[in-house]
Structure formats: C-alpha cells, structure tokens
Amino acid sequence: MKKRNINIKSRLEIQELFKKGQFVKIEGINIFYRFTSLAISRILITFPRVFKGAVKRNRVRRVFKECFREYFTLLKDGCADFIFVVYPQKANINYHEVKTILKNMIVYVIKRKV
C-alpha cells in the first residue's frame, strides 16, 4: 500500500469498522477505530446529513487528513483504521484543535492496546 493512500474506501471495511470497532466520543466528534494488520494506518472523515456546506466539510476533511499524516507515525507498533464522524458544532475547528485531539486520541489508543 502506498504511503500517500491513507483513505478507507471499501464499503465493506467501513461497515465492519462501524460494527466491530472501538468507539470514543469527544465533544462534537465520534471516533471509531480498529487495529489492523496492514502496514499503514488509514482514516475516513465523514459527516451526518445535517452538516451543510461543502466548503466547510472539505476544509474540515483537509485539516484532519493533514494532522493525521503528521501523527500516524506515533502508531509504529500497530496500525489502526480510524473513522471520524464530525458534527456541525465542530464546523469551524482549526488546525491546532485537531492536532491536540489527534495526539490525545493516538495516545489513548496506544494505552488501550497495551
């Protein structure tokens, strides 16, 4: 798998992650994750239907992906797939907020694995 391809695209993988993955809720964001045997961690950012405005959705998506690229190397022992469900109250989230959320989330996931 190429390093730049960090997206989860398969419908079956997405459904399985929603059903069998671990769940964490942070204010305005639901996070599903599951450890995999792949060589790289992957991510999917999705939104409920009430989240209007493609420009805002795409901006949130770009910010999450960039922060994830920066921090997924912390998961060096085991790779995981993540789904972030972002709600409208987090529409104006900035890069630094996402950075702290992802850093705390990855530390939490590493502790849960051990």
Swiss-Prot record:
Coiled coil: none
Domain of life of the organism encoding this protein: Bacteria
Gene3D superfamilies membership: 3.30.230.10
A single cellular component GO annotation: ribonuclease P complex
Pfam family name, one: Ribonuclease_P
UniProt key word DNA repair: no
GO biological process, one term: tRNA 5'-leader removal
The UniProt record lists the keyword NAD: no
Enzyme class, UniProt record, top EC level: hydrolase
Family annotation (InterPro entries): Ribosomal_Su5_D2-typ_SF, Ribsml_uS5_D2-typ_fold_subgr, RNase_P
Family: Belongs to the RnpA family.
HAMAP family found in the cross-reference section: RNase_P
Protein name, as recorded: Ribonuclease P protein component
Gene name for this UniProt entry: rnpA
